[in-house]
Each structure stands twice: as C-alpha cells, then as structure tokens.
C-alpha cells in the first residue's frame, strides 16, 4: 500500500511516476496544537536545577511527544504506519460506493470527502496492483474487508480483526482493494498498515504472506477491583503479559524473539488505569494515541493524535479520561543498518534501489496473472487465503 506515488497502468505493466503528491491532511495535522513545531518540548527537559539535584531526580520515561500526520513516523525496525478510517456508504453492483464520485481526483483521492476516500481506486476504493521489495507489510483490519491478489498467484479476503503479514522480499506485486460488499447498509473501514523493515540478509528472500485470523490473535481483558472491564489488549506481534501472538513469517525480523518486536492494540475504558509492562534495554518503543480525549502516561498529558516515544525499561502507568481511548504500541530492537527508500522499495544502498527498479521493469516481479489490477472477489465470497503453493484457508463470515 502506498500513499504518495503515482501508478500508471499499461496493459500488464505498471509505470511508476515518482512525482510526490502533497499531503494536505498531513501538513495540517503536523501543525495541530503545536504551532510551527511537531515536537512537544517536555518541561522536565529544561530544568534550572543544579547538576547534583538532577542526578537525584529520576528522568521521566516519556522521551518525546510528536504529532501524527497521515503517515505516522516510526522508529527502527519499523518504517512507518498508516491509519485508514473511512465511512464508506452502501455498495453498488460493482462493490464500489453507491454515491457520486464527482469532484474526486480518481486515482489519487486522498482527501476525505463525505467521510471517505477512493485512494488509488477508480471503481472500488483501495490500492490496485503495485510492487514492493525489501521489507514487510502488516495490515491490521479493525473493520471492513480487504481483497488481496498478487504476482505469485496468491489471493485472499480478510477483515474484521484479521491481520495479513506479507514479506515482499526480493519482489512482489500485490493489490489491496476495499470492496463494499453490503448493498443494504454502510461499509465502514478501519485499518492500520505497518511497514516493518527487513535486515540485509533477508531483503532478497522469496515473497511470502501469512494470515493471522482474528480467532488466533490473543485478546486479554483486564478488570478493575470492582470487576468492571478496564482494558482490552490485542497481541498482534510479540509477547505481553505472558501471552504470545501467532508466529510471523519465517524471514521476518519479528521471527527472532531476541528482537522483541511487539504490536499491541489497546482499548482503555473510561476512567481506567492500565500498566504497560517493561520490555528490555535497547528496544525502541512508541505509543500512538489515536482515539480519545484525555490520556496520561506517568501523569504526563499526551495530546490526542500524538505519539510518545518511551523508555522501554520502565513499567508505564497509563491513565485514561472519561471516554474510551485507543492506543497502538510498536516496539522492537533496531536493525541498525542503512535505510534507503525510494517509492515502493526499501534497501540498504542507492545501487540496490536502482537494481530494484531495473529488475521490476525487466520482470514485473513475476507479472500480473489477474484479469485486472483492481482485482476484487465475488460479493458472496467468504474470508479465505489461497497461497502460492496452493494451500487454501477458508473462514466463516
């Protein structure tokens, strides 16, 4: 999934237009509540105390607070995260919006209008076939449906709590379309797409994807002293509170436990308190506050739609205000290698990026075996995954 590069479709080939698209929403959000700065200056970082007094006082575990834009900044080993939330209307016969598309920049529709966007889609919202190399995409669908197709011949439909974890490796084309399967009611969509880097040793592995179906993802429900629900924690990657997420793909940086990669989605009930347990020294840990109106980490106010970089070695007490709040936690040991990204490719050197483009234009990373780039499956199709080796997974609903 990409947000700032143009794709021009010519038969069974795609031309990548590297002209960047100005993201007005990101520019706006980047200034929201912060004036001209995107980083909150924490008061305790500018103390007038003496050196001896400073040595006696514990440093606050929140290192930095940053505003969130359309693409959320992340720390190594992650590359970035995008939070898509669209209130799609009823679907039409083609599983596109049963609404006028007039006034939209079809093919590059990233401005919210009437509560939703078409993205790169022309008929159905989503992201028609496009290439990747050198990293992984982790697509966490909170609500709605995603149809997958790729250049290996694999395909799938997933949603409503499912997660697709795709290793692009040496190169793959894939499409991610958002079919509006209901003609009788609205089709709301919410998902995160997280880009996780691959180390140099794994950048040219065979493409692969794994499905983490919603019934395999551990969910912890915590209650307060009165027995009332206080927090719901989904463990998408890694380990938290002695619960382990499903295994990631075999070549993932997350597959080695010593890398402590974690992806945790946490819902906090009104007026609740939650303790996020410590990880280990060296891990990069960031908390993304994406829903709610009042949140404190160790008694420090965190503005809505901001991220807090925190000390991974500290247990953190998170206090919620009088409405439901939601946070996403990303953590992991850094890969600590050079990162060179150009469009859909992430490698270690400029020469490798150039080679990625040359290989793509020569091979199309296996070509596109589907009848169209904005491939969607039949409306009545249930959730499924068909892998490149022919294995099929079928799910109800």
Question: What residue ranges belong to the model's regions?
Answer:
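N-terminal secretory signal peptides
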Residues: 1-27
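Glycine- and acidic-residue-biased ligand/ion/polar-headgroup-sensing regions
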Residues: 133-149, 153, 162, 169-170, ...
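C-terminal segment of N-terminal export signals and the immediately downstream linker at the start
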Residues: 16-17, 22, 42-63, 376-379
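Conserved metal-binding segment of the jelly-roll/cupin
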Residues: 158-173, 303-314
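N-terminal export signals
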Residues: 27-47
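N-terminal, Lys/Arg-enriched amphipathic/low-complexity engagement segments
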Residues: 57-140
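C-terminal flanking tails of non-heme Fe-dependent oxygenases
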Residues: 305-307, 311-319, 324-397
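Ligand-binding loop in jelly-roll beta-barrel domains
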Residues: 169-201, 312-341
């Amino acid at each position: 999934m990409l947000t700032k590069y143009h794709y021009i479709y010519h038969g069974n080939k795609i031309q990548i237009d590297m002209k960047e698209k100005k993201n007005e929403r990101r520019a706006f959000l980047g200034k929201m509540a912060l004036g001209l700065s995107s980083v909150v200056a924490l008061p305790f970082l500018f103390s007038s105390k003496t050196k001896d007094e400073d040595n006696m006082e514990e440093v606050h575990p929140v290192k930095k607070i940053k505003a969130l834009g359309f693409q959320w900044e992340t720390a190594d080993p992650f590359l970035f995260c995008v939070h898509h939330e669209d209130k799609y209307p009823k679907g039409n016969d083609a599983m596109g919006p049963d609404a006028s598309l007039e006034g939209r920049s079809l093919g590059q529709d990233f401005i919210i209008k009437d509560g939703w966007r078409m993205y790169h889609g022309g008929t159905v919202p989503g992201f028609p076939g496009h290439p990747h190399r050198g990293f992984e995409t982790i697509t966490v669908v909170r609500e709605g449906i995603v149809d997958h197709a790729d250049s290996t011949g694999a395909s799938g439909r997933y949603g409503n709590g499912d997660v697709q974890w795709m290793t692009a490796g040496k190169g793959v084309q894939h499409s991610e379309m958002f079919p509006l399967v209901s003609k009788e009611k609205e089709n709301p969509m919410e998902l995160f797409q997280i880009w996780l880097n691959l180390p140099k040793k794994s950048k040219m592995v065979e493409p692969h994807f794994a499905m983490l179906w919603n019934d395999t993802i551990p969910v912890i429900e915590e209650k307060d002293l009165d027995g009332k629900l206080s927090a719901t924690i989904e463990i998408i990657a890694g380990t938290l509170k002695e619960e382990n997420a499903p295994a990631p793909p075999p070549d993932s940086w997350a597959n080695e436990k010593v890398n402590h990669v974690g992806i945790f989605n946490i819902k906090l009930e009104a007026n609740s308190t939650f303790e996020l347990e410590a990880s280990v020294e060296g891990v990069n840990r960031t908390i993304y506050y994406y829903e709610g109106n009042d949140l404190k980490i160790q008694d420090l106010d965190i503005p809505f739609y901001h991220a807090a970089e925190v000390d991974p070695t500290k247990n953190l007490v998170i206090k919620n205000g009088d409405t439901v709040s939601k946070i996403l936690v990303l953590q992991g040991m850094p890969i600590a290698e050079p990162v060179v990204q150009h469009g859909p490719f992430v490698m270690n050197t400029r020469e490798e990026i150039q080679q990625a483009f040359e290989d793509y234009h020569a091979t199309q990373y296996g070509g596109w075996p589907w009848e169209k780039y904005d491939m969607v499956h039949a409306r009545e199709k249930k959730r499924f995954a068909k892998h490149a080796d022919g294995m099929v997974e079928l799910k109800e609903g």
